[in-house]
């Protein structure tokens, strides 16, 4: 336990938490423009072709974002909404594109977990 005089001389240090999504700059989502849309392969034990996009954000950062769901309509110059959330088997991919927002369409023929993929309730 420090004395009051020691605290006057050298105050207690605040523990700063390092953010996992620095490009969002304390916002829940950010808008950006796709500069490149391409596919990549995951790390070792997994095997797939994952769809990703390089996005220039309004905060000035250029990040790699994952495109979730089956099929997409994104191309270069598409305006997209980015949220945090990494993809465990893709190194360097720390953001997700929000489906159904701005230029990104919802996933076709999706009936379950629709809210996560930007799909309206089907007419029954």
UniProtKB/Swiss-Prot annotation:
Belongs to the universal ribosomal protein uS12 family. GO terms for biological process: translation. Keywords: Chloroplast, Plastid, Ribonucleoprotein, Ribosomal protein, RNA-binding, rRNA-binding. The keyword Membrane does not apply. InterPro entries: NA-bd_OB-fold (IPR012340), Ribosomal_uS12 (IPR006032), Ribosomal_uS12_bac (IPR005679). With S4 and S5 plays an important role in translational accuracy. Located at the interface of the 30S and 50S subunits. Part of the 30S ribosomal subunit. CDD domains: Ribosomal_S12. NCBIfam families: rpsL_bact. The gene is rps12. This is Small ribosomal subunit protein uS12c. It is found in: Plastid, Chloroplast. GO terms for molecular function: rRNA binding; structural constituent of ribosome.
């Amino acid at each position: 336990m420090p004395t009051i005089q020691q605290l006057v001389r050298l105050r207690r240090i605040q523990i700063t938490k390092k953010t996992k999504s620095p490009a969002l700059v304390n916002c829940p989502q950010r808008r950006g423009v796709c500069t490149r849309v391409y596919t990549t392969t995951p790390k070792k034990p997994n095997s797939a072709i994952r769809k990703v996009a390089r996005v220039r954000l309004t905060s000035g950062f250029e990040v790699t974002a994952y495109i979730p769901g089956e099929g997409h309509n994104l191309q270069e110059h598409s305006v997209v909404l980015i949220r945090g959330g990494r993809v465990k088997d893709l190194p360097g991919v720390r953001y997700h594109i929000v489906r159904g927002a701005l230029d990104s369409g919802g996933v076709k023929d999706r009936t379950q977990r629709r809210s996560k993929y930007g799909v309206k309730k089907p007419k029954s």
